[in-house]
Amino acid sequence: TGSNQVRSKSVASMGGGPVALVGVTARMIGTGEDLLGEKLYMHQFKINGKRAFQGDVWQWHQDYGTWKNDDLMPTERAMNIAIFLDEVMPINGPLMLVPKSQHAGDLKASHDLETTSYPLWTLDEATVTKLVKDGGIVAPTGKAGGMLMFHGNLVHGSAGNITPYPRKIVYLTLNAV
């Protein structure tokens, strides 16, 4: 829809403060290291929000596509830790994940500069349809403070939020050293 609302805010533009402490929590990074089996560093720390009544869509994508093309991340040995700042409900634009899609590897993506205010490397409908046929779609929900971890190649997206309930999620992106 091309709205001009803020959809994502990185820690570099937020300054420090208590929220930045989450990014250096050894327990979180340690859990990621256990999952990927190697030492990790924090590549990115951001808050993605979907405002009440105005939260926009996130097209189907893999985060690694953006990290590779925009950040020049050399390999796909990366993951996200998502921490819910608001309750994530089936109705307020939860993440929709395609289970096991990370096993398809780094998929061909196109740079979408027009759909929303955030340029994103997105997947075509045929690719998403095949992956969904194989793995289905899940939309994890949870209370504020809930956590979700997923590989950078996991295909995901989310619908808009037209409810009175905001949905904010902190993301720690961890990458192999």
Q: What do these predicted ranges mean?
A:
Residues 1-71:
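Non-heme Fe(II)-dependent double-stranded beta-helix
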Residues 38, 69-75, 84-94, 102:
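Active-site region of the double-stranded beta-helix
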Residues 44, 76-82, 92, 137-139, ...:
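Extracellular structured ligand-interaction cores
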Residues 57-65, 154-158, 172:
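Histidine-centered catalytic micro-motifs
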Residues 65-78, 135-136, 142, 165-166:
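A short beta-loop-beta micro-motif enriched in histidine and acidic residues
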Residues 80-83, 99, 165-177:
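A short hydrophobic beta-strand segment most commonly corresponding to one strand
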Residues 88-155:
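Double-stranded beta-helix
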Residues 159-163:
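Short proline/glycine-enriched turn/loop segments at secondary-structure junctions
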